[in-house]
Every structure is written in C-alpha cells, then in structure tokens.
Amino acid sequence: MYDLLKTIDDPAALRRLDRRQLQPLADELRAFVLDSVSQTGGHLSSNLGTVELTIALHYVFDTPHDRIVWDVGHQTYPHKILTGRRDQMHTLRQLGGISGFPKRDESEYDTFGTAHSSTSISAALGMAVASKLKGDNRMGIAVIGDGAMTAGMAFEAMNNAGVEDDVPLLVILNDNDMSISPPVGALNRHLARLMSGRFYAAARAGVERVLRVAPPMLDLARKLEEHAKGMIVPATLFEEFGFNYIGPIDGHDLDSLIPTLQNIKELRGPQFLHVVTKKGQGYKLAEADPVLYHGPGKFNPAEGIKPAATPSKKTYTQVFGEWLCDAAELDARVIGITPAMREGSGMVEFEKRFPDRYFDVGIAEQHAVTFAGGLAAEGMKPVVAIYSTFLQRAYDQLIHDVALQNLPVVFAIDRAGLVGADGATHAGAYDLAFLRCIPNMTVMAASDENECRQMLYTALQQPNPTAVRYPRGAGTGVATIKQMTALPLGKGEIRRETSQPAGKRIAILAFGTMVAPSLAAAEQLDATVANMRFVKPLDADLVRQLAETHDAIVTVEEGCVMGGAGSACVEALLASGVTRPVLQLGLPDRFIDHGDPAKLLAACGLDAVGITKSIRERFLLSGAVGGQSSVKRVA
C-alpha cells in the first residue's frame, strides 16, 4: 500500500518521477490523507482538495529554493507528506507532534508560518522582492483560497504587487466554491496554456511598445483584451491590479496544472493563476458535506462521521447561540455579526430564525468591528461573535471606531485561553491584557455556562463597549437559567472562605475558567476563593478587603500574566496602600504549542495540582506567608 508514495521523501524525489506516475501518486496521497486524518482528527476537506495542486507545485518549482506560502495553512497536509513528514503524520496536532499548520522551525519547506487568513500574498511578495534585490532568482508563490481573498489585507498586497513590474511573484487563487463543467474546463485548459505561454507574453509586450506612442490606442487595446478575456473567464479585476490573469483551470487536472505552471515559471512580473478545486475531492462523504468534514475528530472512513451522542454538558458556544436567539426574540434591535465563523461561533440557529439581523461579513474582522460601531451609532444592539485570536486583527477598529466613541457594541469572545490542537496561532492568550487597557471597555470572564449567559445579558444592557470571554468546548455542567438577570457591574463574589487562623490565610482571586481548578486547589490548601467575574471594572473593594483579611494573595487567569487580570489586581493593591505578598499565575511568556487542552493547562501549572503546587512552594513551604510584602509572577 502506498508503494509510490513511500518512495517520496522530498520534492527532489517527486521531480524524478515520470509525468505518467503523478496521477497514481495523487491517488495514493489522497488515500493517505484520508487514512491519516481519520486516525488523528484534523482538517480534511480542504486537504483532499489540494492534492493535485500540491504535487504540481513541487513538481514544477524548485522547492524550497522557490518559496511557497500557504494561506491559512490548514490545507498543507499533502505538502507536509511530500516534504519528509509522512512518517510523522500520526502525531499531527498532538503534544510534541507536528503542527496542523506550516511552521518555519518544523521544516525548511515551510517557508512562512500561517494560520490566520489573507497573509500569504504579502509574505510571498516580500520574499519575491528580496529575491529580486539579492539576485538569487527564486519565485515567491502565494496559494490563497477564495474565502481568504475577500479580506482587505489580500487586496492591499495585490495593490502593492501590481506596481512591481518584474517581481518574481505568482498568486494562485484556490477557488473551491465553484465548479467547472467539462466543456468550460476544456476551453479554459487551452486558454490557460495560451495566456501563460511565451508567445502570448511576447506579443502582448510588443503591441504595448508599439502603441505606447499613442496612449489612447494603448488604452483601447487593453480594454479589448480585457473584454475578450471577460467573455470566457472571470476576475479581470486582477488585471486592473497589474497582474497577468490566467485561468480558471481545473485544479484536479495535472495535465492542465503542470504545463500552465511551467509556462508561468518562465514569465516575469506578477502572475495570477485561478485554479478551481473541490473540497473533499475523492471522498464522496466529504464532497457531499465539506463543512461537516472540515475539521473532524477521529472517525471510520468506511462509515463516515456518525452523529455524536448528546453531550451531558453544553459547550460555551451553544450557550452563546441560545442566548443570542433569546435576546433577539426580546429585542428587535439585536444584531448578530460574524467574520466567516457561523458554525464555529454557534450562529446557525440565529441565521435561520433572524436572517435579516444576521450578518456574515466574511474574513474581515476589521470591517466587522467598525460595521458594528456604525450599527450601534444608529441605536442598534450589535453583537460581534469572534474568536479571541481573530479579535487581535481588529485592534485599531476596537479602539478608534468603537471605544473612543463609547459605542455599545457587545463582543462575544469565543476560544479564550488555550484551544488545544490548533496551537499557538489560535490561542486566546492576550485578550484580557489588550482589552483592559482600553478606556470605556467593560471586560468579563465567565466561570460557567449560566454565568456566561448572564454576563452576555449584562453586556447587552451596558451603554459602552463590553466584552465577555469564554473558552472553547464543554462547560462545567451547570444548568443555564432561562431568566436573564444583569450582574452587579464590577462586582465579584466569594465562592469559598478559609478557616485558617491569621498568619496562614491565603486568598485566591480567580478569573473565568480558573475558578473551578482554584476551588479544587483551595480544598487542599484551605484557602479563600473569589470569582472575580470582572476584569474591568475590577472589584477593587473586594481585592482590598481580601488583602486586609488574608496574609497572601494569589491571582489565577487563563491568559498572559503580563498586563493581564493579575496585573490589574496588583495595581489595585498598590492604589489602596495595602501590601501583601502576591503570586500571579497565568500563561507563560512564550507561545504554547498544540496538544490536548487539559495536558497543556497542566504543563502551564494551571490545573488544580499545578495551582496547589505553586502556592505551596511560594508561601507554605517557604514560610513566606506573613513575611515582607512581595510580588511574584509564575508564568
């Protein structure tokens, strides 16, 4: 099995194959991807759709000398397999295993790290310009999907690239949202070869030289050319950016891909190749439902993904989706906004019930935030459902367009904290730190499902921008109360009180997901636990009260320590004039790799065992409780 694939340990071996062997190789590679992902979980549909394109790129271009940048990067499993990582695929997205995205420190073939969308053209352009300046004759190649192509950053890069006449840049649009009928496919195969050929390029340049003496005639000739292309191919928009547009061609047809890429390799200046592929190609179940098979867990390929048993605990995403529908039922001003994450953010039901108030703005986080600001300015109640890691992309809009004008936009921040298999690129480690420093912001962290629901309702009542953060996955099992009640603004609650005498009293100030492990640790230590609820406005009175009645303070958060919730507590203590030893626990000052979330939290010392150990080492074993004032960060 996989006899041909087993001979390919790097692209050099691939390039030694006869062209007639490439389709059998593609069949083996697709089968290997399916078999591998079914055993580990991961992204499937997108990878099944890029098999032939990946083979063609490594066959035609001299990788890694020529640089391929894969936008988003979750479609790179065939690339990883062909570049020496076939035997590591069983470790995919696991602790200590290979990443599900390109990583520069994993392979020289991963020329640029990606995971967020629409960055590839900028990176490939930078590489191509560097090649031009150094004279090392390498091609910069960006492979970008039709969804990522909608983002502003992609067009900013296109606009910049179009003025670089002789830069060795190729942008490949991997369009998997349309299909080519056989007649059109045959016509476009012929057209792509024609438009990417040397004769066409030379003739085009010659006509331009002749007509340059008569600018009106040159403009007319260009318009006629665009019109001729426009009759049989889409997207002459890219010609306006200064690219030579080629395609669309069938991205599963190696006999079309390879000669077209070989022709493009000989051209200079920015080239744009439109390739049409199908998500889930070659696996009927994924072809029929590419969304279901986008990022599955382990499954039996022969049977497909079976409906999961109803879980005993709701996910926080489900809690948000139910709340949003309930809120919209009560108030016609409630608007739901997502930047291309309808399923992931739990908004499927909202779209069905309130289609006129549902807005999927595409992969455009900056626009999503300012769009929400405009709605809020006109009296609507916009709710932006966004992953923590993607909110980073709209930070200026958050400050300039929403907070500065004190507009009441609700930010429902999903995937806060560590996210597991997707790794550092998707971790929500920084939102507490970057939100709490913004004037006019209210910031809450949910400790369980019902608190999340009530916090979202509280946020909707505020006259200012408000954020509620909650983690990926299942909650704690707490039932949600249908009745929605606003929480007292900026007030935490005591969840457990110590029975220790003076001199041994420790108070743990826990935020969001860290309340549960802090309570478990407190049982071992007999410590007080406060569920702080609000990061901003912080319950400074509660912080001061606990400091006055305890001998040491511990802050615990699933976020970066520097500038985070613990820092807010230290600032409050300093302002109150009460000094106590403080231990700040949180995510370390490094990027956390992929792996099982529970194992990652344990490795960071943020499970009950780790919290207990850190407190004992800092205070109880060292005898620091009751000693001189100090602050220590454990991260």
UniProtKB/Swiss-Prot annotation:
Gene Ontology BP term (one): 1-deoxy-D-xylulose 5-phosphate biosynthetic process
Catalysis performed (reactions): D-glyceraldehyde 3-phosphate + pyruvate + H(+) = 1-deoxy-D-xylulose 5-phosphate + CO2
Cellular component GO terms, alphabetical: cytosol
Cofactor binding: number and manner: Binds 1 Mg(2+) ion per subunit.
Descriptive protein name: 1-deoxy-D-xylulose-5-phosphate synthase
Positions that bind Mg(2+): 146, 176
Residues involved in thiamine diphosphate binding: 74, 115-117, 147-148, 176, 283, 365
Quaternary structure and partners: Homodimer.
EC number: 2.2.1.7
One GO molecular-function entry: 1-deoxy-D-xylulose-5-phosphate synthase activity
Cofactor: Mg(2+); thiamine diphosphate
Pathway(s) per entry: Metabolic intermediate biosynthesis; 1-deoxy-D-xylulose 5-phosphate biosynthesis; 1-deoxy-D-xylulose 5-phosphate from D-glyceraldehyde 3-phosphate and pyruvate: step 1/1
Keywords tagged on the record: Isoprene biosynthesis, Magnesium, Metal-binding, Thiamine biosynthesis, Thiamine pyrophosphate, Transferase
Taxonomic superkingdom: Bacteria
Keyword set includes Nucleotide-binding: no
Family designation: Belongs to the transketolase family. DXPS subfamily.
Native source organism of the sequence: Paraburkholderia xenovorans (strain LB400)
Its job: Catalyzes the acyloin condensation reaction between C atoms 2 and 3 of pyruvate and glyceraldehyde 3-phosphate to yield 1-deoxy-D-xylulose-5-phosphate (DXP).
UniProt xrefs under Pfam families: DXP_synthase_N, Transket_pyr, Transketolase_C
Top class in the EC scheme: transferase
